Each structure stands twice: as C-alpha cells, then as structure tokens.
C-alpha cells in the first residue's frame, strides 16, 4: 500500500519517463533501426523531448479516470499502433503515414491489401486481436485509484497542461526547433518526429482565411488586373508541359565527377530557347505538388505542411486550372503518364482539373519497356504525346508526367556497362546511386531530343515547356549544389514557331501564366493575376487571398458559384475494340482475340468471367483456360 501511495505521488514523473521510452520505440519502428533512433535522440534532443511531451500531454486524460494503468496502456497502445502502421508503410513506399491516410482508415482493408500479403494480413489480424484481448483483460483486472477524484482540480490541471503544451509548440516554431513548412515530407518526419508531423498533417490543412478577406478585397485584387490586354483573336498554338521525374543537372553537384555530360540535349536547348531556374515546392519527392502548381497556377506555400491537394481538397471539388481555362478557347486537355493511373489518385483527380483524356501506362502499347528498377522508360511517351495532338482538329493542352528517373536509387551496381561513370561521392554506395541516376536521366535526355525533333516537323504550332519536378532523393544540402538552393530545377520553353528567347527564373505556379502571356492568352483568374501582378507589391499576400477565395472561401471571384463541372474524362485516346475470336486449341481452350489498341495491361472478361490473358501485339491477345460455347 505504501508503495502504491509512493508511485501515485511520483506518477507524473514515471509517466514522463514511460512516454520518452515509448517515443524512442516508435521512432525505432519508423526508422527501422534502433541505432538511427538513438542518433536522432542524441543529435536532436529538443525535438525528441518535444515529441515525448506530446505523447505525455495526450496521456494526461488518465487523471480523469480511476483505472489509470489501463488508460495509460490504452493511450500508449494507440501511439504504438500508429508507429507500427508508419513503419509498415515505409517498408513499401517513400511517403510516411499522414493526415489523409488517417482520414482513409475507414477503407483500412483495401489499404492493407495494397501493402501486405494475405499471410501478413492474417498475422496482423491475429496480433491485433490478441492486443485487443489483452486490453480487455487489463480493463477488467487492472487496479483502481482508491483516492478521491477531484474533478474540479484535475480537469483544470489537464487543460493547463494542454495549453502549456500549445505554448511550447508556438515557442518551438518561433525558435525554429520545429517547422510548419515541409519541403520534403519524408525528411520532415525524420527531422521533426513522427507525432508532431502526423498531427500537423491531420490538423493543419488547407488555406487559412486571411484577416482582411472580404468581397471588396477580392474585387480590389481583380481590379488590379484591368490593364492586361485582351486575348488575341485567331488560332492558338498547342501548349505542352513535360514534367521530367527527378530531372536536374548533376554537374551542379560540387563533389561529383562525371565521365561525360549526361544532359547535352537539354543543355543545348537551354542555350537556344527561353530557360532558367524552375522553383518547385519540394525536394526529393512531391511530384504531384509540382504538378498541382504547374497546372493550376496556385502556390503550395499557403497550404498545410506537407499537404497534397490531390489527397485533400481536390477530392472534394473542382479547381480552376489551365485545362478549364483553355477549354473556353477551343482546347482539348490531355494528361499522359507512363505509370499506373491511380498513382497519386490521378485517375479520380484529373476530372476535377478539367482533363478530357488521360493516357496512363495501362493504355500504352510499349509499357513493358522498363528500366532496371521497373519504371517504364520515358521514350514511350513521344508517340503518346503525338497521338494526343493528332486526335483533335483544334489546339491541344497536353500535360505529360514522366517516371523513368524515379527512385529509390540502388546503392549497389545494377548497370553492367554504364554509358556514364560517376565518382567523387563520399561513399561507394552514394557513387552507385548517382551512377544509376545519371544514366537514367541521360536516357531521358535522349527522349527530350527525340520528342523535340518530332515536334519540330509537326504541322501545327507547338510550345513545349520541359522541367524537372524536384531534385533526386540523394540527401543533398545547399552546400552540395552550385546554385545553393534545393527547391529548384531548370526549365526550357521550346517552340517551333519562333518565340523570342528570354532568360528568366520562374516558380512552377507562374509558368502556365507565362506561357499563356507569351502566346497572347489572357484568361483565367489565377493566370491573369500572375500576368498582371508578378513582381508587384503585395503579390504573395493577394495571391494567398485569391487562392483562399477560389478553394475555401465564398468564391466572390465567381459571384458565389463554382463554374467548373467535373469532366467526363476518358482513359486513353482511342477506343479498344474486339473484332473477332479464333480457336487456337480446343483441348486447352486457347483462343486468339483480334481487335485494336490492345496493351500489355489488357485483360479479357466474357459474360462476367475474367480469362487468363496474354498480350501478343496491339491487335492480338491470347486467352486460355475456359471453354467458350458461343462466339
């Protein structure tokens, strides 16, 4: 009894120590290493202490109950469960467990199927069941606090603890112990700790209402655009954007030595056409966010830390974008991506951005042309882009997202005879990563030449903007790169009709407006804003207000009603047709399927049943295993 009284008196201290140990275990799980967790704790002690205090604060509710041991174990188990979920996810993807994932937990089974085998799911379900059973036993058999529960004291003290932690959070942000801007969400989780980053991505989302937000303020912003000229009449050129995965100039890395220039074609184009640095919202990851800025003209800076609008607001509403704006001028909007359609949820998001067609890897006949990591090579994109241009009589807007340069880059040699060799990195493992990466972007550079050569002879006017979406995941620091800035790649604005060359650095959210301005198009609220207000006073402040109004506010810009309807987007450019079925072998029920526009992803379903399908070529498939009675 004396021991119980003693432990009750020092329960806060014991709880704090327990939370620190629990947090260390969580970080070890997330980092897949106790050594890395120890390094993190010893090199960033203030961040570690803050996150341990976060868990401690959530555990203060135990003082409102008698079964305090149970509630400590229950709250601790929830944190441990979240840590395990993140650890498992990071075994299968680069992005950690974030707010949007929490909101999708109701679809937990489908998420589990995506990342776990059937056996792993079974083991996980059994372990979860055992954990729940243990918690129930603890609930029934754990001792109760025998003293008097003083709610009039305990509740205010818990609230004081929560408020004090809020003050600590604000102080940590002011002193830059923490940050509320995540350039790379994976690195942010490593730098600022799992509890803080998870909570931030859950609660700090969207764009906060500006203090002076009102209808009159929006009208004032609109009035500042009045001096823009009208959109020129007549025909308009095809507008193409080519977003190159992790593409940047490795000669800018101070320590690298390369056997030859890996991007001679891109470099040549930069000298001959408009070019400059391209400011992007993230480092090492975040393709979809560079994409969002380039398509909509909106800056990610005003959204929540690490937020992906593709996973938040764009699931709920349409958004003003280049496809919607150009549609009013007769453009057809196409998206092209040599990866699966559901990557970043693009298949469901692109209709909310106004795209008319989406050609993903599943709709490409050459999707099986893979690099050593299994990503489809970018060379397959040339024909797909030209197909988009050929499919309509009027002008086209084509947004292409490449994938060949995607990581995670191998630390062991995987190329037998690399065309370009690399040295100078601090370790052999990093040299191997750079050598693999450099040879991939060298092939991407060849693709750039192939595409521009093909478009040079195209019978319609074309302007093509090419740029890297972010720097590669190589652990680069500002000291490592010649330009001393990690949030930028380079772009070139190529054309086949003689646009004047211009050297200018631009942000991703400014590029679409710049292209439209260069070809005489002055449409769209966001794009006109950039054209009229860039480099003027309060440019960023008013941009934040405008973005808030369009996505989260009362939409004064549209007189209170969003004018953009979700498009009925089709997958692929041309229909897939089935023309005939021929018997190959009656003994094992093998048949030829004749048709058009088949790809390696084609699957045959007849009368509600799926058949084993083998791709032969774009006009022929083989199905087998089941007898067809009537065809």
Where are each of the predicted segments found?
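Short secondary-structure junctions and interdomain/linker hinges
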Residues: 68, 88, 115-122, 142, ...
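Membrane-interface segments at or immediately adjacent to transmembrane helices
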Residues: 169-241
């Amino acid at each position: 009894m004396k021991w119980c009284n003693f432990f009750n008196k020092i329960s806060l201290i014991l709880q704090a120590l327990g939370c620190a140990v629990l947090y260390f275990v969580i970080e070890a799980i997330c980092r897949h290493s106790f050594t890395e967790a120890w390094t993190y704790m010893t090199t960033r002690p203030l961040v570690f202490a803050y996150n341990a205090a976060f868990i401690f604060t959530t555990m203060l509710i135990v003082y409102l109950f008698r079964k305090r041991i149970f509630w400590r174990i229950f709250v601790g188990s929830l944190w441990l469960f979240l840590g395990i979920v993140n650890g498992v996810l990071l075994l299968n993807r680069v992005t950690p467990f974030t707010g949007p994932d929490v909101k999708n937990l109701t679809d937990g089974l489908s998420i589990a199927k995506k990342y776990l085998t059937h056996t792993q799911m079974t083991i996980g379900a059994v372990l979860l069941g055992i954990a729940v059973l243990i918690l129930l036993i603890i609930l029934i058999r754990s001792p109760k606090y025998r003293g008097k529960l003083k709610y009039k004291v305990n509740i205010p003290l818990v609230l004081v603890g929560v408020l004090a932690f809020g003050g600590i959070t604000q102080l940590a942000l002011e002193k830059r112990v923490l940050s509320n801007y995540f350039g790379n969400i994976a690195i942010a989780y490593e730098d600022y700790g799992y509890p803080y980053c998870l909570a931030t991505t859950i609660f700090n989302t969207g764009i906060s209402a500006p203090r002076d937000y009102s209808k009159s303020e929006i009208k004032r912003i609109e009035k500042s655009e009045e001096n823009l000229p009208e959109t020129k009449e007549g025909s308009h050129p095809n507008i193409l954007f080519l977003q190159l995965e992790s593409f940047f100039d490795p000669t800018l890395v101070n320590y690298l030595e390369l056997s030859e220039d890996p991007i001679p074609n891109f470099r040549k184009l930069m000298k001959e056409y408009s070019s400059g640095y391209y400011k992007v919202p993230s480092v090492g990851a975040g393709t979809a966010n560079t994409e969002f800025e380039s398509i909509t003209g909106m800056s990610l800076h005003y959204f929540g830390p690490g937020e992906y609008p593709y996973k938040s607001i764009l699931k709920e509403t349409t958004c003003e974008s280049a496809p919607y704006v150009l549609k009013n001028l007769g453009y057809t909007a196409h998206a092209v991506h040599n990866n699966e359609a559901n990557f970043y949820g693009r298949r469901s998001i692109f209709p909310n951005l106004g795209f008319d067609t989406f050609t993903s890897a599943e709709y490409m006949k050459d999707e099986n042309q893979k690099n050593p990591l299994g990503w489809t090579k970018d060379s397959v994109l040339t024909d797909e882009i030209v197909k988009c241009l050929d499919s309509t009589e009027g002008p086209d807007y084509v947004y292409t997202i490449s994938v060949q340069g995607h990581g995670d880059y191998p630390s062991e040699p995987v190329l037998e005879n690399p065309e370009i060799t690399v040295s100078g990195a601090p370790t052999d493992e990093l040299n191997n990563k750079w050598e693999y990466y450099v040879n991939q972007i060298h092939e991407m550079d060849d693709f750039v030449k192939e595409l521009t050569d093909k478009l040079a002879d195209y019978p319609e006017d074309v302007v093509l903007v090419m740029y890297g979406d972010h720097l590669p995941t190589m652990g680069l620091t500002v000291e490592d790169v010649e330009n001393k800035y990690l949030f930028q790649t380079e772009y070139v604005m190529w054309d086949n009709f003689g646009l004047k060359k211009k050297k200018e650095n631009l942000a991703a959210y400014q590029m679409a407006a710049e292209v439209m301005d260069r070809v005489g198009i002055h449409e769209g609220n966001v794009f006109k804003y950039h054209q009229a207000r860039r480099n003027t006073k309060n440019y960023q402040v008013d941009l934040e207000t405008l973005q808030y109004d369009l996505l989260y506010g009362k939409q004064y810009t549209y007189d209170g009603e969003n004018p953009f309807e979700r498009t009925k987007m089709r997958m692929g450019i041309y229909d897939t047709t089935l023309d005939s079925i021929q018997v190959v072998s009656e003994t094992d029920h093998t048949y030829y399927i004749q048709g058009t526009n088949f790809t390696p992803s084609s699957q045959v379903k007849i009368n509600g049943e799926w058949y084993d399908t083998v791709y032969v070529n774009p006009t022929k498939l083989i199905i087998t295993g089941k007898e067809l009675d009537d065809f």
